[in-house]
Amino acid sequence: SMAVAPAAMADMNGYDISNWQCGIDTATVPADFVIVGTTWGSGGVYGGCLSNGVNTDANRQLAGAVNSGKETGVYHYARGGNPETEARFFVDNVRGYIRKSVLILDWEAQDNAAWGDKQWPRRWAREVKRLTGVNPIIYTMDSGYWQVAGMETELNCGIWIAQYATNMVTGYQTAPWNIGARGEVMRQYTSNGSLSGWSGRLDLNKFRGDRAAWRKYANPDDKGAADLPSVKPKPQPTTAPTVDLNALAARTIRGDFGNDPARRQALGGNYAAVM
């Protein structure tokens, strides 16, 4: 099964960007892979370089990554409309990248009317598979994992987990907190990443596999990669590293965690202290 990452391979480092990083030079900001947000909902969303639900800087962002030898992924931000309609909107807008870039669903609480509906990401993934022949990877915050749990075996979807130990500024980490705890293929461990060539903050990720594994997710027919062995999730540690509550409070005020109940989920055990 491809859906669960191996315990030890040549892991890769990368960042994910969206309409908030318009103009970033993906050729020079260091990474093994770059993931680009391409579509939101089924249109009608604007902001940054986002026009009618499409990231107008995505082609340039992806070209810089490809031309500098990086692997790529493209994601769709779920807004919770009809899942098949959103899947088609995504596929229609990333046709040139299918079987070259990993296809991803961004499943999170903010601006998502279907948050909490376990069937929505499954229907979206099935439609993407029907249209492209590719099983997408599913991104969600650790507190939302229950909604997508089982998609690894049901639909052969890799899982990408977001969970932050602290909000301190950091570069790439070799062993992020809790990595592998969900048997995930990829882990996003900060939204306060700092890399040379970009003055803003970035989401940083570790992919638990090598380039051949990445390409196998992008193109299941790729003969260059063997299927990955499956691993059992490790039990979750009971204590998190020290959390910077002031930074969490600042991000809460800024709206990073949305509103209750999503905010309560995102902040987890720090909810009372931050609020």
Where are these regions (language model features)?
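Repeat-associated, polar segments at repeat-unit boundaries in modular proteins
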Residues: 268-275
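Active-site groove signature of glycoside hydrolases
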Residues: 92-120, 124, 138
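Structural recognition of the beta-strand scaffold that forms the well-ordered cores
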Residues: 13-16, 32-37, 71-76, 101-107, ...
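Functionally critical loop-and-helix segments that line ligand-binding/catalytic clefts
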Residues: 6-28, 32, 152-240
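Solvent-exposed loop/turn segments at secondary-structure junctions
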Residues: 19-23, 38-44, 77-83, 108-113, ...
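N-terminal carbohydrate-binding/catalytic regions of secreted carbohydrate-active enzymes
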Residues: 8-77
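Conserved, mostly hydrophobic/aromatic
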Residues: 29, 65, 105, 128, ...
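Extracytoplasmic Gram-positive cell-surface binding/anchoring modules and repeats
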Residues: 251-264
